[in-house]
């Protein structure tokens, strides 16, 4: 029930036909006087722009044309010749005018189609036939009723006699089922049914004493039913008639307090009827049962016309004599956010003089007991997350009861089976059989090669497996056989024993690529063998020096004799005696061997290729082989890597070789190299590289399969390919024990393409009901991945087990040992629903303070107490003489939200005043179930959040008496407040004073107050009895019980104390909790002399609709609120408040504003001057007040106090947003500062907020 748009006109109106964006045609109402006393009459067209969530300023007409007279009625119909149709106007001067809507919208001068004046007096009503859009019925003064054909508009024919009648035809309506039946209602009370085909009167209803008829409407589905309305203020009735009994109405609808002026029966749902009248109200009825659903917001003058939108019945419009046509919706919006903002603003504006001059329009809301017919569905089905289909069917045809069925559903059953098979195989752990199976069923050579390589990696010696896969095992055996024929690998006996091999495991002598120094194992023990033959005597004597040696021989011999093997090596190398040099190097150790090898390789410039390979192997520089070997020998390079590469370099060497193959692939597009590169990446465990190749292969194979498939769908093909990819990656990760080191990163992942496939696969398997499998793969994706986070949350919600609900007894009590003599606790609570319906108003709470500014437990906007009265449209509360007057502190933390209610059964700190008992003749309040309550729970008729803007405050809107229940013939729901919040025990409030003098008023707390100790919070169970705690000592006695009957908290009948002009209203107080915990205030000294003096507030006054907050920090963290300027001096304490520190510079001085704050001053002051120069004179007070508050801000900036640097920076950004007319950004910054930095806000914050609003409204 939200007002979406307003047209500022006192006019009759008509909706545009068709499904296009709705337009409204308005014609100046005859006899009405506008605010300017203008006598101009015109026809205007308005574009409602309902597709836009918000509109700035008033609506402006899109077309306008002046007329000769005012309008009594308007009608708009479709036309074959005009896309936008034809508009007909019933004018006060008796003219019937027709306009072309297309030409009006185009601004054409010849928009008038025709102008006829067959009526001798004013035309009162007109309507197009719903079946034949060219037929137009018009009724007017002296009983004249004409039927016009648009094809021959100049020659209408008249129904009924030509004799003049004294009564006027005030209304008419075509039958919605029978095209030639028409009904009219006259001022003399005649309701006549006409047969246009025979041009005769069919029957006249006995209209209950011939009371005047102001409106008539046919049932949209039943051709014999209609409703009529009477405009009499003494007896406003809506009568439902069935033509089969024309002597008496079938039923009467009573609810209006004054005459009914308009009716509109919904064409899409015959159970919905709108009525409006002289009581300023628009009501919604069920004419089939006579039940009144509720009423819409009351306006300030008669509502003379209401109409459903003919195409979209979610909308309707109502015209009233207060100068507005309101376009509303029957749907509810979530108003809690808007209410919170309104309460917050009201709290901020609590001291403002003009804030109290305006009142909020009455907010009415009700819920239909069943959805409208156009929203009903006899059956429906939807796909649910997790492989489920939810279907709804009627239990029995014709009944409203439905049954819900949830069934599993799989798009492709093969997907589910393959997923289960793979997961089962993984649990068994037989990876080799998986690889063998997938390789055997591979669809391409590349896929088969991948599985074979992964299988090779499973072996205990992966490198040996890779070499064997490359086919080098057979070649090595062949080379060994060839060498055996040469007799180079015979095992020789040394000292009668076979020499043992010096190589490692599996290495044979003289195998391919073995070192030339390992060919003869006896070389390692050459010298030792010579030494072992110490005692042997041979027949081959020799001379160390025989005189024929050259200088080189002598040098080598001398060096050997002295053990200087390095010098001997140098001489041998210099003489190029490589054989001798290598033998000497063997004796000299590793250093000499390395030197001899280096010299040897330097000399071999034109040597065979194996020499360079040998150099790389000996020098442990396999990078030379990887980067420089021809790619046609990549297998040989890979075999060398598997044989000689260090473990730490092996992966990088394989990756480098694979990169070379990929680069060559891009150059010559040889698809075979992609498989070779994949092998290298697999061997090096480079998942990020091989995944890119696999995904590319997936796309190609998928496209090829789609082109050749006969029966498979594209989805099934894609899912099977995706399944294969996931299986390969999963097995590869397990085989190589891959660890993803980037899961903690927030972006720039190397495996981002794989993560996308994981998310896609998780979505597929989740769609097939495998939520656990989906969760498993989503856990492999980084936590900060946005899409994975959404998917994980969906699965978490889908797999969440429902919490078992404990049944609450109807009335639960908690038995505890009494700590002291308890106050009497009558069981005043009655079980009700956990959510009270959004009633327009409730009985004022007899123990809620009228305006407790020092209340530390002011409630948030969301009520969680089932006994809390709704605050949707509560009237102003009477001034409570027992409530302390409100302090006018600028410290109003409106953004503060108390924590949640404590757990059940917690011990309270103390009671307050118990709820008053019900009178003995009262019965428990009936439970009313509504579809929409003041909660965050959505209902069927909720609009999207933010669709409609909150109602704008208007001046002088009466707070009309509201209905306590949206359903008639039911007793109003009495609501009870929750138990008092936590706090120390305060004495009970005595009866009202009998004297004439007002009680002393307390305007500020004592300067020093003790901090409250931390105690358990009170129970959240609304049905539990209130536990007791010992009362505090008091100068007054505690009454034995609370008397029944009128509440002792009501104001005394004589001479109530004057209300504090600056005290915020209860709604404002509810949104302005104090951040400090207040201790009980001791009674004033004068209290001893007056036993009826009011008690000071206890710690945390009780306010309805508030969950008990936890204990707050001690009062040193926030200063106590200051007294209002106009409040009386405190009588509660002789202590004085500390005087505020004087400013460094006088007010108005702007010469000391720092540079970073200067944009705030310059932009805001300039925009304030712009608003001030263009604002209407009637808003001068508001503009001046906003300027005054901005000057407070500028003073703070000039003194460099209150505002911190980050707040000044945000204010500068806010100012620049205002300068750029980006008011949404400015408002967002304003709310952020007000919410998160409340200690820096003050009166100046209201000025900034008002400047944003005024600047937005100022052109």
Curated annotation (Swiss-Prot):
Disulfide bonds: none
Organism of derivation: Aspergillus niger (strain ATCC MYA-4892 / CBS 513.88 / FGSC A1513)
Chief place where the protein resides: membrane
Self-association and partners: The COPII coat is composed of at least 5 proteins: the sec23/24 complex, the sec13/31 complex, and the protein sar1. sec13 and sec31 make a 2:2 tetramer that forms the edge element of the COPII outer coat. The tetramer self-assembles in multiple copies to form the complete polyhedral cage. Interacts (via WD 8) with sec13.
Region annotation Disordered: where it falls in the sequence: 822-845, 868-1154
Name of the molecule in the record: Protein transport protein sec31
Stated role: Component of the coat protein complex II (COPII) which promotes the formation of transport vesicles from the endoplasmic reticulum (ER). The coat has two main functions, the physical deformation of the endoplasmic reticulum membrane into vesicles and the selection of cargo molecules.
GO BP field: COPII-coated vesicle cargo loading; endoplasmic reticulum organization; protein transport
Compositional bias of kind Low complexity: 834-845, 924-939, 950-968, 1004-1014, 1062-1079, 1129-1138
Entries under SUPFAM superfamilies matching the protein: WD40 repeat-like
Gene Ontology MF terms in the entry: structural molecule activity
KW Lyase (keyword) present: no
Membrane topology designation: Peripheral membrane protein
Keywords, alphabetical: Cytoplasmic vesicle, Endoplasmic reticulum, ER-Golgi transport, Membrane, Protein transport, Repeat, Transport, WD repeat
């Amino acid at each position: 029930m939200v007002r979406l748009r307003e047209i500022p006109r006192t006019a009759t109106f008509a909706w545009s036909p068709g499904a296009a964006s709705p337009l409204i045609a308005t014609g100046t109402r005859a006899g009405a006087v506008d605010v300017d006393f203008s006598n101009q009459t015109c026809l205007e067209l308005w574009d409602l722009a309902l597709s836009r969530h918000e509109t700035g300023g008033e609506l402006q007409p899109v077309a306008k044309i002046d007329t000769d007279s005012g309008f009594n009625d308007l009608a708009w119909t479709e036309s074959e010749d005009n896309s936008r149709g034809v508009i007909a106007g019933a004018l006060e001067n008796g003219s019937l005018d027709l306009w072309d809507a297309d030409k009006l919208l185009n601004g054409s001068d010849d928009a008038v189609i025709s102008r006829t004046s067959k009526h001798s007096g004013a035309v009162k009503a007109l309507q197009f036939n719903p079946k034949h859009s060219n037929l137009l019925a018009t009724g007017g003064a002296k009983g004249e009723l004409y039927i016009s054909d648009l094809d021959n508009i100049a020659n209408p024919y008249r129904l009924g006699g030509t004799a003049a009648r004294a009564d006027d035809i005030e209304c008419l309506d075509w039958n919605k089922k029978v095209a030639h039946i028409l009904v009219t209602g006259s001022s003399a009370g005649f309701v006549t049914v006409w047969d246009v085909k025979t041009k005769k009167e069919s029957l006249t209803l006995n209209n209950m004493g011939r009371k005047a008829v102001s409106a008539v409407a046919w049932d949209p589905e039943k051709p014999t039913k209609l409703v009529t309305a009477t405009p009499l203020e003494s007896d406003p009735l809506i009568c439902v008639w069935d033509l089969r009994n024309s002597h008496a109405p079938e039923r009467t609808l009573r609810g209006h307090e004054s005459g009914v002026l308009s009716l509109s029966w919904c064409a899409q749902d015959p159970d919905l009827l709108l009525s409006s009248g002289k009581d300023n109200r628009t009501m919604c009825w069920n004419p089939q049962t006579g039940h009144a659903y509720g009423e819409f917001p009351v306006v300030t003058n008669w509502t003379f016309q209401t109409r459903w939108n003919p195409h979209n019945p979610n909308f309707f419009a109502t015209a009233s004599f207060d100068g507005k046509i309101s376009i509303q919706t029957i749907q509810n919006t979530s108003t809690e956010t808007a209410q919170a903002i309104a309460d917050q603003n009201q709290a901020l504006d609590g001291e403002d003089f003009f804030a109290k001059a305006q009142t909020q329009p009455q907010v009415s809301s009700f819920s239909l007991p069943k959805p409208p017919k156009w929203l009903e569905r006899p059956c429906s089905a939807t796909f649910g997350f997790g492989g489920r289909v939810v279907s709804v069917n009627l239990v029995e045809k014709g009944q409203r009861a439905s049954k819900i069925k949830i069934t599993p559903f799989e798009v492709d059953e093969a997907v589910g089976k393959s997923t289960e098979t793979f997961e089962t195989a993984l649990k068994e752990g037989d990876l080799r059989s998986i690889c063998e199976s997938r390789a055997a069923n591979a669809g391409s050579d590349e896929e088969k090669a991948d599985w074979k390589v992964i299988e090779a990696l499973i072996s205990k010696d992966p490198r040996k497996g890779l070499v064997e896969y490359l086919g080098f095992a057979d070649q090595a055996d062949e080379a060994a056989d060839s060498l055996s024929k040469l007799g180079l690998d015979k095992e020789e006996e040394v000292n009668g024993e076979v020499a043992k091999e010096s190589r490692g495991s599996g290495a044979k002598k003289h195998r391919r690529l073995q070192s030339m120094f390992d060919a003869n194992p006896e070389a390692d023990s050459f010298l030792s063998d010579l030494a072992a033959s110490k005692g042997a005597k041979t027949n081959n004597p020799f001379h160390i020096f025989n005189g024929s040696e050259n200088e080189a021989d002598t040098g080598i011999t001398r060096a050997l004799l002295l053990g200087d093997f390095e010098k001997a090596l140098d001489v041998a190398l210099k003489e190029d005696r490589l054989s001798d040099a290598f033998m000497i190097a063997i004796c000299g150790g590793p250093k000499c061997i390395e030197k001899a090898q280096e010299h040897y390789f330097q000399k071999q410039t034109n040597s065979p290729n194996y020499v360079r390979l040998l150099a790389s192997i000996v020098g442990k520089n396999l990078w030379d082989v990887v980067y420089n070997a021809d790619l046609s020998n990549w297998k040989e390079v890979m075999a060398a890597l598997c044989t000689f590469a260090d473990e730490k370099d092996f992966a990088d060497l394989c990756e480098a070789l694979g990169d070379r193959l990929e680069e060559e692939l891009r150059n010559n597009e040889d698809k075979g190299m992609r498989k070779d590169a994949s092998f290298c990446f697999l061997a090096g465990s480079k998942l990020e590289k091989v995944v890119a190749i696999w995904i590319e292969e997936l796309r190609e194979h998928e496209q090829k399969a789609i082109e050749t498939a006969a029966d498979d769908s594209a989805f099934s093909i894609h899912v099977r390919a995706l399944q294969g990819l996931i299986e390969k990656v999963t097995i590869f990760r397990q085989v190589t024990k891959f660890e993803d080191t980037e899961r903690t990163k927030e972006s720039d992942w190397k495996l981002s393409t794989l993560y996308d496939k994981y998310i896609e696969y998780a979505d597929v398997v989740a769609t097939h009901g495998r939520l656990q499998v989906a969760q498993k793969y989503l856990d492999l994706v980084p936590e900060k991945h946005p899409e994975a986070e959404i998917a994980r949350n969906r699965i978490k919600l889908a797999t969440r087990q429902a919490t078992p609900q404990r049944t609450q007894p109807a009335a639960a009590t908690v038995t505890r040992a009494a700590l002291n003599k308890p106050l009497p606790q009558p069981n005043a609570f009655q079980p009700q629903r956990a959510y009270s319906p959004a009633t327009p108003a409730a009985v004022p709470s007899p123990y809620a303070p009228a305006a407790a500014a020092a209340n530390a437990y002011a409630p948030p906007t969301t009520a969680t107490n089932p006994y809390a009265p709704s605050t949707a449209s509560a009237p102003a509360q009477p001034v409570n003489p027992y409530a302390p007057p409100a302090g006018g502190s600028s410290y109003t933390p409106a953004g503060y939200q108390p924590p949640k209610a404590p757990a059940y059964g917690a011990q309270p700190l103390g009671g307050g005043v118990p709820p008053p008992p019900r009178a003995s003749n009262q019965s428990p309040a009936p439970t009313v179930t509504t579809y929409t309550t003041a909660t965050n729970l959505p209902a069927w008729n909720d609009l999207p959040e933010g669709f409609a803007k909150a109602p704008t405050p208007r001046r002088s809107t009466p707070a009309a008496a509201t209905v306590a229940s949206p359903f008639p013939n039911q007793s109003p729901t009495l609501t009870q407040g929750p138990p008092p919040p936590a706090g120390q025990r305060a004495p009970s409030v005595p009866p009202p004073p009998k004297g004439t003098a007002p009680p002393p008023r307390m305007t500020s707390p004592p300067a020093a107050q003790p901090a409250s100790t931390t105690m358990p919070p009170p129970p959240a169970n609304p049905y539990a009895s209130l536990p007791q705690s010992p009362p505090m000592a008091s100068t007054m006695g505690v009454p034995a019980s609370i008397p029944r009957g009128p509440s002792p908290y009501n104001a005394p009948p004589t001479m109530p104390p004057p209300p504090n002009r600056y005290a915020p209203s209860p709604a404002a107080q509810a949104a302005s909790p104090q951040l400090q915990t207040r201790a009980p205030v001791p009674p004033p000294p004068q209290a001893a002399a007056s036993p009826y003096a009011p008690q000071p507030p206890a710690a945390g006054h009780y306010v309805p609709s508030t969950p008990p907050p936890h204990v707050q920090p001690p009062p040193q963290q926030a200063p106590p609120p200051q007294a209002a300027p106009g409040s009386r001096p405190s009588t509660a304490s002789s202590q004085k408040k500390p005087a505020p520190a004087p400013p460094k510079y006088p007010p108005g001085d702007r010469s000391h504003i720092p540079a970073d704050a200067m944009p705030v001053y310059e932009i805001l002051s300039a925009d304030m001057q712009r608003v001030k120069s263009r604002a209407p004179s009637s808003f001068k007070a508001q503009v001046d007040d906003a300027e005054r508050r901005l000057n407070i801000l500028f003073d703070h900036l000039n003194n460099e106090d209150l505002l911190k640097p980050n707040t000044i920076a945000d204010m500068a950004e806010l100012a620049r947003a205002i300068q750029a007319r980006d008011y949404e950004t400015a408002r967002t910054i304003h709310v952020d500062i007000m919410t998160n930095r409340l200690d820096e806000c003050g009166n100046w914050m209201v000025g900034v907020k008002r400047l944003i609003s005024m600047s937005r409204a100022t052109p």
